[in-house]
């Protein structure tokens, strides 16, 4: 019987298959790297802002509630960047309107009235042109996220934003990736607390497992994991 031999063109085909496999494998590896590497998903993103607003000072040392500035977070999908008038409550006045030197006046705030760092705030109050802040936490394209739903279901600001009250300059602490969101939706209980405590970033319950379980049951937390929840 005559021996069978593959035609010579098979050699080229074999090389083509190997090259295709390497190309596809490299592409998939690159996609995986892009999906999980902190530098790609913006973990640590810490842009400079037109006004060096310190959350460590305002939310930490002074104890301002998150909702004083982000006042739509309980009723709207977006947390909202505060209007300059909110800054003006403390920083928009001048010394002539103060009831006591160096302290806020009755109608206009005069805290740090001559600080050059706050000049963009004073300019904005005078011209009505908004201060152009740089976004820190940017979701991927075509993703829907509703702040009010999460806040009212007992998810604390700290779960997504970290200890903002300890940040001199705000930075992104979590990847905000699909996997990260799904991990919580599949097992939300450890992140659920009394809605009255969502802005208390330092809060630690005495018996975490029991506490979170009780509040998850009380609030009826059963998040969906279907695609349409986030992609609408």
Set out the residue ranges of the language-model regions.
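Membrane-embedded segments
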Residues: 65-132
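Membrane-interface loops
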Residues: 135-137
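A broadly conserved sequence feature marking short terminus-proximal activation segments
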Residues: 21-57, 110-133, 143-152, 187-203
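N-terminal export/targeting leaders of redox proteins
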Residues: 1-52, 56-60, 64, 68, ...
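Residues that flank catalytic or metal-binding motifs in active/ligand-binding sites
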Residues: 49, 83-86, 139-141, 180, ...
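Copper-binding active sites and cupredoxin-like electron-transfer domains
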Residues: 174-178, 182, 187-200, 205-232
